[in-house]
């Protein structure tokens, strides 16, 4: 149902239910949680990619389960039905989106830091037509990523947003040829994994934390988050710059 592969510091987590368009059932949600628990705990892991098998990212929660009464066991205080969507990891996750990322699948894509979409990608709140609410972060993350007006356009109409429009909105961060989303996401993940990770994670954590703070609190949090990177990485990085690394836009040596 869920497969995990590793390539050095880059992990790839694949939802593998192509016969269900990678809809997530409770067992798959548990496997996604376990996969990202392992990714978070592995000190050698730097970036994860989340994708789906068979040309579809994820069609959402498995409505066959909901129709059989699975929703009656829903606990709003527990993990999200789609898996890790109520967590904030300390490391970045990139979504590689082929085909549909809709309903809960949209919420999984929104949970990721970045979304690399193929030209075939389709995003949407398709659960609108079935009376199924967004309960895996969709109403929270979507406005933060695309703005309130565009988020409400998607939430109220349930319409499809194709790759070009998603890119223009900032819902997709990269758009590549059909079938190339995973390859492009792996290339991007390798670039991110090559940077000094203490500094990268501190800046990322500050970017997420600032939503909960006033401006003064956010600036102080950013300043405090810079202490460890300055002690452990910045001096060495400044030395490499002084010695000529990175001049002319070349960053092979990090």
Where are these regions (language model features)?
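Glycine- (often His-adjacent) and acidic-residue-rich active-site loop
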Residues: 30, 52-88, 101, 131, ...
